[in-house]
Design a protein with these regions (language model features):
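Bacterial Sec-dependent N-terminal signal peptides
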Residues: 1-25
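A broad, structure-centric signal for solvent-exposed, well-ordered loop/edge residues
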Residues: 8, 14, 36-39, 84-87, ...
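A general structural-boundary detector
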Residues: 9-10, 20, 88, 134, ...
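Sterically constrained small-residue positions within well-ordered secondary structures
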Residues: 13, 40, 149, 237-239, ...
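Short, glycine/serine-rich, charged loops/turns that create anion-binding
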Residues: 14, 211, 288, 506, ...
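Beta-propeller folds
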Residues: 22-405, 409-410, 421-422, 432
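Serine-hydrolase catalytic core recognition
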Residues: 216, 273, 278, 413-718
Length: 718
């Protein structure tokens, strides 16, 4: 009996010890960082979902399942073995998983799948492959479900293969200087591709970019025995830019015409759209100064200009990001997005350019037009109508009446079914890492079915304390939102070294009502090391309206620094923040902000780590740089004020600068020029370059990067 009691006591002690050990488990960067060996195991559980018409399909590795939208029950639709058997797969056609399965035809049992060598279309009721296309060696692959024709780039030339596989070569002069069928204008203005199929699949609009006149930036590949010269075309602010034209290829006539848009010099063509009848092409045309934007229509057969439908000007800039979208139930009307009233909203036009109605309005932003509900004649949108940090889903009818489609605060993303009657609502909240609901929006009141509630994948680890709040901007009026990450055993009576993490630039914000208030995993790692991390979204960041973003116009970094210093003032009021041990870190625009803060407020920040930093905007690219700063010729004071070269002499604290050796976004000239200025000024920054890496470190190099950043603060801030 005594022996049994002893064993029981030992078992209890072991269980308690194991529980404590599990609760005390520490993160490593292999756990937290993208590219880490254990990163995938600490992600919230997910389901990969897609629509087959109005039927919901779960695409998994080994099988695709049909999901009952009310109960969530799963029925096998087909398996991976089925697909490879029906397709009589060889090495080229062999499908390795079903995660990327898509169902392009709402009323047909056809699934499209692919690998790096081929794309196939399989009839899973007839159990046979009905179409295939070899894609080995191809880039910019674009498939039309209507004609089953494909567009692609091979050896710099643009090709189209029709639905029967007949190959048509559209270009012969393609090169690194003459680029066909790929994204242009350095992916600005919402551009992410270079080919655009007409709705009937019989015509292909495509970009042709002549960048022969653009200066080469001298990148070097150091990995061969003899390092090789691999230049990038990089148009810097105020310098000669490329010229873009838009071609249209007709499958029936096998002829190409070009839109008669006039001289493309110093102009941007973006947001290409088709009319529902495939006869007309629409695009936004923007001047180089980016303050005069026009929506223009063209005859898709002749290339002739039809009409200028809309014009928007600004004393700062206009930034078109979205193509127009025609109403599925009325081909004579389209919806356009614009910030012309101060916030991004939807406007209804007729096809001749007459504005019929502003469909959404108010001091909030339409973040995405998700799609259309044809039965209710409504538009499904994502917007921050309730609060700047919450991204919610709404339905908007043609009268401008808005109805909310879900009931939970947080950050929502939607996938809409073919008819628009159902949507997959995947959302997160500060305390819920992933939830997936199915919403039936065909009723007067939306009906919701619950599909997934992911458990906390970090359970059992030492988790920090995540907080969110707001302070006033430097203007004394505007609310700015912050996130603070504290050690898990935070003691308000102690003082903690604190790091300000900053981005601060356009088209990004760091604080949202998502899991952990959108905290980056590195912040958790730093809190585990005993730091507080503070993140503030200053004026200039996204989703707060036009005036909030454009407050930084022609003076990047200045208003942003004023707001960040308001954050520092707030930190100074907190007794647990050690103001003698304050650091700052950021990447890209955040790297620019880091060095700006270190050199404009040298007595405030003790340590900084700046990654991929812009040093002088005259070395940045034309499209982004000139939108916010103008050119060095028309805004010399702004360029001089924001340049960090003249501020190298102000550096007092420890500063580490990190760059990808082959960065083609913020080219190494920035970092190297600042180092040269520091040499001349007698200041001593540290420098580290990642060979072969571009603007962001990929794969496991990212783990190394974040260990280096962390160690720098460990060495000099504590």
């Amino acid at each position: 009996m005594m022996r049994i009691k002893q064993l029981l006591a030992m078992a209890i002690m072991l269980a308690v010890s194991t529980t404590m050990s599990a609760q005390d488990k520490l993160f490593t960067l292999e756990d937290l960082n993208y590219g880490g060996n254990n990163y995938a195991n600490l992600r919230p559980k997910n389901m990969w979902l897609t629509w087959w018409g109005d039927k919901l399909v779960n695409t998994d590795v080994e099988a695709c399942y049909l999901i009952d939208k009310k109960t969530g029950e799963k029925t096998v639709l087909f398996t991976l073995d089925d697909i490879n058997t029906w397709a009589e797969s060889n090495d080229e056609k062999y499908v390795r998983h079903l995660m990327n399965a898509s169902f392009p035809y709402p009323d047909q049992p056809l699934v499209q799948l692919g690998n790096r060598k081929a794309v196939i279309l399989v009839d899973f009721e007839a159990k046979k492959m009905v179409w295939q296309d070899s894609i080995s060696g191809q880039n910019a692959y674009d498939w039309s479900k209507d004609s089953r024709a494909t567009a692609y780039v091979e050896d710099n030339q643009l090709f189209v293969a029709d639905g029967k596989g007949k190959k048509h070569q559209l270009s012969t002069d393609g090169s690194r200087e003459i680029v066909y069928g790929q994204s242009v204008h350095r992916n600005e203005f919402g551009i992410d591709k270079g080919t655009f199929w007409s709705p009937d699949g019989q015509k292909l609009a495509f970009y042709r970019m002549d960048q022969s006149m653009v200066t080469d930036y001298p990148q070097v590949d150091i990995f061969p025995r003899n390092a090789s010269y691999e230049p990038d075309k990089y148009p810097m602010a105020g310098m000669t830019s490329h010229k873009v034209t838009v071609g249209v290829y007709d499958l029936n006539t096998e002829k190409t015409i070009y839109l008669q848009a006039g001289d493309p010099t110093d102009r941007y063509f973006t947001n290409i759209a088709w009319s529902p009848d495939s006869k007309t092409i629409y695009m936004f045309e923007l001047n180089r100064g980016q303050n005069d934007c026009r929506l223009v229509s063209y005859n898709a057969t002749t290339g002739e200009k039809i009409a200028e439908l809309y014009r928007e000007t600004s004393d700062k800039y206009v930034e078109p990001l979205h193509p127009i979208e025609f109403l599925p139930w009325d081909a004579t009307k389209f919806v356009m997005q614009s910030q012309k009233d101060g916030y991004n909203h939807l406007y209804l036009f007729d096809k001749n350019g007459k504005e019929l109605k502003q469909l959404t309005k108010g001091p909030w932003v339409v973040m995405k037009l998700v799609g259309f509900n044809q039965k209710q004649k409504s538009i499904i949108i994502k917007a921050n109508k309730e609060h700047p940090l919450h991204h919610r889903l709404y339905s908007v009818n043609m009268k401008g009446e808005i109805k909310q489609l879900e009931t939970v605060d947080g950050v929502h993303n939607a996938k809409l079914s073919a008819s628009g009657s159902f949507l997959v609502d995947e959302y997160v909240t500060p305390t819920r890492p992933r939830v997936i609901d199915i919403v039936d929006i065909s009723h007067l009141s939306p009906l919701t079915s619950h599909l997934l509630e992911a458990e906390d994948p970090w359970a059992g680890y030492q988790q920090p304390i995540f907080e969110c709040g707001s302070i006033k901007a430097a203007d004394g009026v505007t609310d700015l939102f912050y996130r603070m990450v504290k050690p898990h055993d935070f003691n308000p009576n102690k003082k903690y070294p604190t790091v300000v993490y900053v981005y601060g630039g356009p088209h990004a914000n760091n604080v949202q009502a998502s899991w952990h208030w959108a905290s980056r995993p590195w912040e958790t790692y730093m809190s585990q090391k005993g730091y507080i991390v503070f993140i503030l979204d200053n004026r200039g960041s996204q989703y707060r309206g036009r005036d909030f973003e454009q407050a930084t116009f022609h003076q990047l970094g200045q208003i942003e620094m004023q707001d960040q210093m308001k954050g520092v003032e707030y930190l100074r009021t907190l007794p647990y923040v050690d103001m003698d041990h304050l650091g700052v870190h950021g990447w890209s625009f955040g790297g620019f902000m880091t060095i700006s803060l270190m050199t404009n407020y040298p007595d405030v920040f003790k340590v900084g780590v700046a990654g991929g930093p812009v040093i002088d905007w005259k070395w940045y690219e034309v499209m982004y740089g000139e939108r916010y700063m103008g050119t060095p010729e028309n805004n010399p004071e702004g360029y001089a004020k924001t340049s960090l070269i003249s501020k190298a002499k102000n550096l007092k604290g420890k500063l580490q600068i990190i760059t990808g050796y082959n960065d083609n976004t913020v080219v190494p000239q920035h970092c190297l020029s600042f180092l040269d200025a520091c040499i001349k000024a007698g200041t001593q920054p540290d420098f580290f370059a990642y060979p072969g890496e571009e603007h962001n470190m990929r794969g496991h190099a990212s783990v190394h990067l974040h260990e280096r950043i962390t160690q720098y603060f460990e060495d000099y801030l504590k």
